[in-house]
Amino acid sequence: PYTEEALYHLVARVCQTQDVLGRQILIENPSSYLQYVESAMPEWEFLAELAQRSGCGVLLDVNNIYVSARNHGFDASAYLRVIPRPIVQEIHLAGFTVNRFDNGEILIDTHNQPVCPAVWTLYHQAVQRFGQIPTLIEWDADVPDLAVLVAEAERADAILEERHAQAA
C-alpha cells in the first residue's frame, strides 16, 4: 500500500541500491489492477515523494498510467500534472489488451499491441510537460513486422520533434 511506512522502507532500499551502484537509478510507475484499502496517498504522490527523498529518477510509463487510470477511474492527465518535471528521465510507451468479464473490463499491460490513440494523446501531454525525454516503445509478445515497429518509433520521434520545434 502507498503509506508512509512503505515509503520509508522503499526509500531506504533505493538509497542502499544507489550507494552500492554509485549512481542514480530510475523507478518505473507500475500498471495496477487492484487498489489497497490501506493506502494513505495516491500512487503519483508516493512516486514523487520516493524520488524526492531518495534522489532516484522516474521512468514514466505512460501506458501504465493510462491502464491504471482506466482500471481505477482516475484522471491520467492529472497524474502527469503532479509529477515534478525534473524527476522524469525516461518514458515508456506500450500497448495493452482489454479483458472483458460479466461486471465490466480490465486493461492489462501486455506489450503486445500498438500504442493506442489515447496513450499517444497522453504521451503528447507528457512531452509538453517534461520536454524531450528519451522514449522507448515496449513490444514483448506477438511482435509484428519491422515496418510496424518502425512506424511506432517514428510517431514517437515526430511528437518529440514537434516539442523541440516549439521550444526553439
Residue map of PLM features:
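Gly/Pro-rich active-site loop or hairpin
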Residues: E4-L7, N71-F130
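Distinct, well-ordered alpha-helical segments
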Residues: Q35-Q52, S68-R81, A147-V150
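C-terminal helical cap(s) of enzyme catalytic domains, especially alpha/beta-barrels
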Residues: L146-A167
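Conserved, mostly hydrophobic/aromatic
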Residues: I25, D61, I91, T135
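Active-site beta-loop-alpha junctions enriched in small/polar residues
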Residues: P30-S32, N63-V67, L93-V98, D140-D142
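Active-site acidic/histidine proton-transfer and metal-coordination neighborhood
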Residues: P1-G57
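Generic structural signal for well-ordered alpha-helices
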Residues: L10-Q18, W44-A51, L80, W120-V127, ...
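Conserved active-site loop/cleft motifs that coordinate metal ions or position small ligands
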Residues: P134-D140
